[in-house]
């Protein structure tokens, strides 16, 4: 890693759209990293955002924020990729595959050529497929290529459960796993409120109906569509999730977060990036937590993985993209 050992933490953000600009804002507000470079093809807008963000520093903490070039990634600790074609109303994340794979190659190649030796964090959609593509295009070790995965989905899940039972969302422990998209699934078997399983909570609180739990998951799964139809894009939630992941990396936290990670036998899956709880620190992914799933949950995991694998295989064949591994 380039700078973490020196107590100077540097992030390069590629993509200054709605998600990227809010992510940079979240880093600024939370005092994460000492240096943030922003790369985008719309350079004037990026320069404006860098100046605007810098104006907030007197209220937050010292930081260097600037419009960057790909070459600035050379000594960065983390490169965060949010650039890509946006998801339109009525469009699934998987509809974006071919467009965003082409864009991704134009990003990863110059980043690698800069001499970058840190961690890739991918948020562009479809995130599981683009994380896999970043790994293939970069030639980086699988531990140092990470996708935002189901981090936002799990946060939504916890928040909605918390609202239903009237507790703090931070006291709810629950995961969404699989694809960040239509085939994701809730891990009800391990969901708990302060250590009490959801199933036990429902028994003890008759006012909580099991049908409400089903509606909660459907709301979580479809949240992006709802938000996009209402305001055109999602960015506050995912920008904050990316800031949380970045902090876990830079501060060497060994945090357990639901991320898009490379499967090497876990859950019976191989050669795919998919959402699962994993331990993350400044080295990247150090351990994938293989949660004991029910038969139904395991079936859902494999269904999700099959869809992702089928699409990524087809996309790479059709686009004939040259990779480094």
Swiss-Prot record:
Coiled-coil region(s): none
Binding site for NAD(+): 19, 40, 45, 70, 84-85, 106, 123-125, 148
Catalytic activity annotation: (S)-lactate + NAD(+) = pyruvate + NADH + H(+)
Residues that hold beta-D-fructose 1,6-bisphosphate according to the record: 158, 173
Keywords carried by this UniProt record: Allosteric enzyme, Cytoplasm, NAD, Oxidoreductase, Phosphoprotein
Amino acids binding substrate: 87, 93, 125-128, 153-156, 234
GO annotation terms (biological process): glycolytic process; lactate metabolic process
Record-linked PROSITE patterns: L_LDH
Enzyme Commission identifier(s): 1.1.1.27
Top-level taxon of the source organism: Bacteria
Record's function text: Catalyzes the conversion of lactate to pyruvate.
UniProt-recorded name of the protein: L-lactate dehydrogenase
Source organism per UniProt: Latilactobacillus sakei (Lactobacillus sakei)
């Amino acid at each position: 890693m380039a700078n973490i050992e020196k107590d100077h933490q540097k992030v390069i953000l590629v993509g200054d759209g709605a998600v990227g600009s809010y992510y940079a804002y979240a880093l600024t507000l939370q005092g994460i990293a000492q240096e943030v470079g922003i790369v985008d093809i719309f350079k004037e807008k990026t320069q404006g955002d860098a100046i605007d963000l810098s104006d907030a520093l007197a209220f937050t903490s010292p930081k260097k924020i600037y419009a960057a070039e790909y070459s600035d990634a050379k000594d960065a600790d983390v490169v965060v990729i949010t650039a890509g074609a946006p998801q339109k109303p009525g469009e699934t994340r998987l509809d974006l595959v071919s467009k965003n794979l082409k864009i991704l190659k134009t990003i990863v190649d110059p980043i690698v050529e800069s001499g970058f030796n840190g961690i890739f964090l991918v948020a562009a959609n479809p995130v599981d497929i683009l994380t896999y593509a970043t790994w293939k295009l970069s030639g980086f070790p699988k531990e140092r290529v990470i996708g935002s995965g189901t981090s936002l989905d799990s946060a939504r899940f916890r928040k909605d459960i918390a609202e239903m039972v009237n507790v703090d969302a931070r006291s709810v422990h629950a995961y969404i796993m699989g694809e960040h998209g239509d085939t994701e699934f809730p891990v009800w078997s391990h969901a708990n409120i302060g250590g009490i399983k959801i199933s036990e909570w429902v028994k003890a609180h008759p006012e909580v109906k099991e049908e409400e739990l089903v509606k909660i998951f459907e709301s979580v799964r479809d949240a992006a569509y709802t938000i996009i139809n209402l305001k055109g894009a999602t960015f506050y939630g995912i920008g904050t999730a990316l800031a949380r992941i970045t902090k876990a990396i830079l501060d060497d936290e060994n945090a357990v977060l639901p991320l898009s990670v490379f499967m090497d036998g876990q859950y019976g899956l191989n050669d795919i990036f998919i959402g699962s709880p994993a331990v993350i620190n400044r080295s990247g992914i150090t351990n994938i937590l293989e949660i004991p799933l029910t038969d139904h949950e395991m079936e859902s995991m494999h269904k999700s993985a099959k869809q992702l694998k089928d699409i990524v295989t087809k996309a790479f064949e059709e686009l004939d993209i040259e990779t480094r591994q």
